[in-house]
């Protein structure tokens, strides 16, 4: 039985509408994030692969189904799947996953992997917006990720290398049942130079940025923490500037969702926020994030991006200002902006959105943890 059964009535309603709109009999998902969206479980054995070891499907006549091989079937049935899913197993030596699905699915059908004769499905629109059950799971997930990254931030020392800190982060996440496709650690030498500070064998030194993207049950969380031992004199001002851009992005996201605007409209507000905090061109140095949910980012905003901004939905904006970064996963609804990656064990800073974006939005966001060397 899947430990995190998804809201299957909602999934069925969305998939019925998709089949009707596209004149199909079935749709299949073998990519891990969409498999997790539909089942609440995992089809991953090889973390480097973009396709899992099973495909979850919805059949107009037969309902929820899973196709896998004889190696994986017993484990998936016992540990990863709700009982409502019917399972079929092909001999491991006989067929590829694509061939096994093709042999068992009614047609016409669609899939998120290449299957001869099947249409292609982009599941991102099906995964949005979030349901109440998704949101409840997200709150627990966000708290667990925050606890993991903060436990490491509270224990590192200046002589730790970036790779040692990254190893500690992965361990803290794994013990909480979380898989982390992204773990970044940038010390005082490299964090000001690079936006993606992939860990190296260098000491973190005077301060460090710790950034992770982790997932469980299909849902993804991204967040960053800053820990300082002998902080550069510019760090506090740059961190506050990044936080203010993030809060402005969240305010603009809520406005866009209410108005039916798109990602490009939010990006314009982000550009305005950077200008307001004195870093007008800084947005050109790094992507700013976007919608989270059942992917690290369902979409990443750009100046001309036309993705519709929806609510309720999780968003992870990640503005940077030359060695400082503010990032968290936040639930945006019609009437609330709720940070998900928070605990009571880290210092916070209350910051308002810039006036050109919103004059009445103020949020508490993670601040810099100052520690003795």
Task: Please describe what each predicted stretch is.
Residues 1-373:
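Active-site neighborhoods and metal-handling regions in enzymes and metal-associated proteins
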């Amino acid at each position: 039985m899947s430990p995190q059964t998804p809201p299957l009535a909602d999934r069925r309603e969305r998939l019925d509408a998709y089949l009707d709109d596209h004149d199909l009999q079935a749709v299949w998902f073998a990519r891990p994030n969409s498999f997790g969206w539909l089942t609440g479980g995992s089809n991953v054995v090889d973390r480097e692969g973009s396709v899992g070891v099973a495909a979850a499907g919805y059949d107009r006549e037969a309902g929820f189904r899973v196709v896998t091989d004889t190696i994986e079937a017993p484990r998936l049935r016992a540990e990863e799947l709700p009982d409502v899913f019917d399972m079929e197993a092909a001999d491991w030596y006989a067929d590829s996953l694509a061939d096994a699905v093709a042999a068992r699915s009614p047609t016409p059908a669609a899939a998120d992997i290449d299957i001869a004769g099947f249409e292609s499905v982009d599941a991102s629109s099906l995964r949005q917006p979030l349901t109440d059950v998704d949101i409840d799971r997200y709150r627990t997930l966000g708290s667990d990720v925050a606890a993991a990254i903060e436990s490491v931030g509270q224990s590192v020392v200046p002589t730790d290398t970036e790779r040692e800190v990254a190893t500690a982060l992965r361990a803290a996440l794994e013990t909480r049942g979380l898989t982390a496709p992204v773990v970044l650690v940038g010390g005082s030498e490299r964090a000001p130079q690079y936006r993606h500070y992939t860990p190296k064998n260098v000491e973190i030194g005077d301060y460090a940025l710790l950034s992770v993207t982790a997932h469980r049950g299909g849902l993804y969380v991204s967040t960053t923490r800053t820990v300082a031992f002998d902080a550069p004199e510019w760090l506090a001002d740059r961190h506050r500037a990044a936080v203010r851009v993030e809060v402005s992005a969240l305010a603009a996201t809520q406005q866009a969702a209410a108005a039916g605007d798109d990602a490009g409209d939010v990006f314009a507000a982000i550009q305005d926020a950077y200008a307001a905090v004195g870093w007008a061109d800084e947005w050109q140095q790094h992507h700013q994030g976007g919608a989270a949910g059942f992917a690290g980012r369902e979409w990443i905003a750009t100046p001309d991006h036309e993705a519709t901004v929806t609510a309720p939905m999780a968003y992870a904006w990640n503005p940077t200002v030359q060695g400082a970064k503010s990032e968290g996963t936040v639930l945006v609804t019609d009437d609330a902006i709720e940070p998900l990656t928070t605990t009571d064990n880290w210092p916070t800073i209350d910051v308002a959105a810039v006036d050109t974006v919103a004059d009445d939005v103020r949020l508490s966001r993670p601040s810099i943890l100052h520690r003795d060397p």
